[in-house]
């Protein structure tokens, strides 16, 4: 989570210095959790992308299971259907899995040297009259692509000038960042005053006493009500069903004049 021009967003960034930003086992779950946060909070998802796709010797870890492989890209479609934008700044080379990252967001902003292309045996096979790829077909594909080196299919020239995938292209890397900020600025945001139910105030009890109540010694129990009284506006707390489930404390309180729900474990009960 981060703020872009004072608006919250979920940010996913490739670290191209580690395995060229490749996918490894468990990454799809991490990406899916990030999209879940964007959905729950109704805030944009922003990628800074320079991804070399799936690490080939870990394919079985990436594609096996339900929340893997293409799940993050399906989640992009879900967010867009809900009106939650997915923005991507594209840098460097993004083949295969990196290509899906590139094409599935709502708005694509690219550095002039960026490129994106999906790949895999199935895609290459689909380009061949035969339903599979053999040595003859592979050599034919290699020969055919030699003529594309001056204007490769995944280049900015193609995806900005021909397919129209890329919305904007910048000669400087900083220009991509500035464009992302520009589009985030265009998005609506909540005004907290709409949800404020009271004038903000400090707790009536001394907040600094929390350091004496909650100690590093985890074997020493403490009274959770003493903690609650030093966290919320005016030290006010409206407890819900106090006689049920004594190991838990639930209720309503205010933080900075905003109404919040409270769930706390009671120390020393179980």
Where are these regions (language model features)?
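Short acidic (Asp/Glu) and glycine-rich catalytic loops that position anionic groups and cofactors
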Residues: 156-164, 202-211, 263-264
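Short, well-ordered loop/turn elements at secondary-structure boundaries
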Residues: 4-6, 40-42, 82-83, 102-105, ...
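Short, electropositive, low-hydrophobicity segments enriched in small/polar residues
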Residues: 10, 25, 57, 96, ...
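Catalytic cores of large soluble enzymes that bind and process phosphate-bearing ligands
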Residues: 23-26, 64, 148, 165-179, ...
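Terminal amphipathic helices with adjacent charged low-complexity linkers/tails
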Residues: 168-225
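Long, structured ligand/cofactor-binding scaffold of large enzymes
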Residues: 1-87
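Non-catalytic terminal/interface segments that mediate subunit docking, oligomerization
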Residues: 1-13, 17-19, 30-33, 39-40, ...
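Conserved catalytic cores of soluble enzyme domains
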Residues: 49-192
């Amino acid at each position: 989570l981060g703020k872009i021009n004072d608006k919250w967003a979920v940010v996913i960034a490739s670290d191209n210095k580690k395995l060229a930003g490749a996918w490894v086992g468990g990454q799809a779950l991490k990406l899916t959790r990030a999209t879940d946060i964007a959905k729950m909070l109704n805030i944009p998802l922003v990628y800074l992308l320079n991804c070399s796709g799936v690490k080939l010797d870990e394919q079985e870890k990436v594609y096996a299971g339900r929340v893997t492989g293409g799940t993050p890209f399906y989640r992009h479609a879900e967010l867009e259907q809900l009106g939650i934008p997915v923005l991507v700044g594209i840098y460097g080379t993004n083949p295969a899995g990196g290509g899906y990252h590139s094409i599935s967001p709502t708005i694509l902003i690219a550095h002039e040297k960026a490129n994106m292309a999906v790949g895999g045996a199935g895609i290459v096979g689909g380009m061949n009259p035969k339903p599979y790829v053999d040595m003859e077909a592979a050599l034919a594909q290699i020969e055919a692509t030699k003529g594309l080196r001056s204007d490769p299919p995944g280049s900015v020239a193609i995806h900005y000038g021909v397919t129209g995938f890329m919305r904007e292209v910048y000669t400087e890397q900083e220009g991509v960042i500035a464009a992302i900020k520009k589009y985030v600025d265009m998005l609506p945001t909540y005004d907290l005053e709409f949800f404020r139910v009271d004038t903000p105030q400090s707790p009536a009890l001394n907040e600094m006493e929390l350091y004496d109540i909650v100690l590093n010694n985890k074997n020493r129990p403490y009274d959770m009500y003493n903690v609650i009284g030093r966290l919320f506006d005016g030290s006010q707390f409206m407890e819900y069903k106090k006689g049920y489930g004594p190991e838990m404390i639930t209720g309503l309180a205010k933080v900075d004049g905003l109404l919040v729900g409270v769930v706390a474990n009671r120390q020393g009960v179980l």
